Amino acid sequence: TPLYSSAASDVYKRQVFIGTSYYFYTVLSKQNIKKSTANGGVVSEDEGRLQLRYYWFNYSKSGVFDCHVNNEIKNKHFKYTFTGRNLGESRTKLGANNLYTGKFKFPVQDDNNEVAISVSSNVPQPLNIISGGWEGLYIRRNSAV
């Protein structure tokens, strides 16, 4: 069936978002420290405790998205929303549908074995996460002799 749309005003030479709104949700894999082996391979360093402090996502021309930090063992659930608005920017106007490029950093403050980090969005604006990373504290419990 054909899709028809109309606009309440003239949209000539204006940016317009057209598309279907859908729910995006993904859970990231467990974060580990990687170490190179003598034969050129890579293994996870899991002999200690990795305390994740912060996580961040680099985004490009992106709209609103949510970052979830969930720990089912401790029953802790936090949601951090990137609103697409940065205070102090001159482009931040009410009613404007701007896209932003930058870095969104949020706290985790949990053990890497217990926490699950996920990203979700259900807005019609584009979601374009190009990379991510984390800061943490690693304490090795034992060492080879």
Predicted regions: what is each one?
Residues 18, 55, 117:
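Hydrophobic, well-ordered secondary-structure elements that form the walls
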Residues 23-67, 122-145:
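Exposed low-complexity, polar/acidic, P/S/T/G-rich flexible segments that act as propeptides
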Residues 45-59, 76-107:
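Short, intrinsically disordered, low-complexity segments enriched in Ser/Thr and Pro
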Residues 13-15, 52, 114:
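A general structural motif
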Residues 14-22:
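Catalytic cores of secreted or luminal carbohydrate-active enzymes
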Residues 1-8, 12:
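Single conserved hydrophobic/aromatic residue that forms the stacking wall/gate
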Residues 65-80:
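Short, surface-exposed beta-strand/strand-loop-strand elements in extracellular ectodomains
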Residues 9-10, 86-128, 132-135:
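Beta-sandwich interaction modules
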